[in-house]
Amino acid sequence: MTFSIGSKITATDYNELVTKTNKIFADNYPASVPATNPVTRSNQAFGWGNQAASITNIGTKISANLVNEVIDRLNVSSEHTGGQYELDRVIKGQKITASIWNDIQTVIDDITPNKNTAALGQTAVSQLGVISHSSGFNNTLTYIVDLNFSSYNKGRYFFNSGSTIRLNLDKVNGNAAASSWASVYQRLGTVSLSLTNTVSTTSNIISENKGFEDLDATEQLLLTCNSRSGGGYGYGYGYGYGTGDNSYGYGYGYGYGYGYGNGGSSRRVKIYGQLIPTNGDFSSGAVTLRLKVVLTSPDTNVTGTHSLYVESNKATSKTSESASFGITAPIYSGSSYA
């Protein structure tokens, strides 16, 4: 909404801007649960879960303090998303003009498309945990990563803010089979789970294009990384000719050979995700994001120490006068079995 010079700004007008601001900075959809409906998903992608700006009553005078609640939240939001603008706060006694209102709307329009993006320098990586497996494995090794959020909405806020969960594998020591697995780990790269997708720092993976918003209580495949070695191809051809007539002799013969072979071992990493709600209810109580990393191959007696590193790339906290922005990281636990 654009205001013309001289237009009277009412409580209804103010509340409309507050609602748009809170939709991003706070949460207008607190009853969210996993959804498949595109409209519902689109709505639930809004919201960082911070303290809302105040809605005012009809007939209330729009004061500098009220307007500054909106301005402060938009300035923090613009900083976080890498926006183009920073608004000046209103001084007590200053007239609230149409120009100020239009500037606020401009900033909202700038921030909204980037609500799920954290600008460069607005996140920080921290290690949540390491799962090390050193007892060897045959054919299959499975890592279980449990990331506990106090509610489904807390998980939403984490991923809506542009925060991600990162996974990478490494090995120390071990036999030839372990060294082959180390090559697979390099191919896999660092995997990042975001709101809408699961990707890697390399191009060697097959993503299912699913992120946090796609997850529910059913386990789903998120990503695959394959490595195959070995193969052979052979081709042979021979020709001879002969015949005989009186004192002249000539011979004929023909030979042809063809061969093809494909051998070696296939090693594969698959990553799965699901959400586990307390007592099966997403609407109340804690929710665990479970990531399962499965290594499979024909290899037997793989030795060495194989470790899965789990990191949080979380939006950093920031403040601007009356507005404070903060995202809570999940509580980590992990295990492995072969």
Question: For the regions a protein language model found, what residue spans apply to each?
Answer:
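Short, surface-exposed beta-strand/loop "edge" segments at domain boundaries and coil↔beta transitions
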Residues: 172-183, 296-306
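Long, compositionally biased low-complexity segments
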Residues: 155-157, 163-174, 182-187, 217, ...
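Solvent-exposed, flexible loop/coil segments flanking beta-strands in beta-rich domains
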Residues: 115-181
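Large, modular interaction/toxin scaffolds in secreted and membrane-associated proteins
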Residues: 177-214, 337
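Polar low-complexity intrinsically disordered regions enriched in Ser/Thr and small residues
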Residues: 96, 124, 132, 139, ...
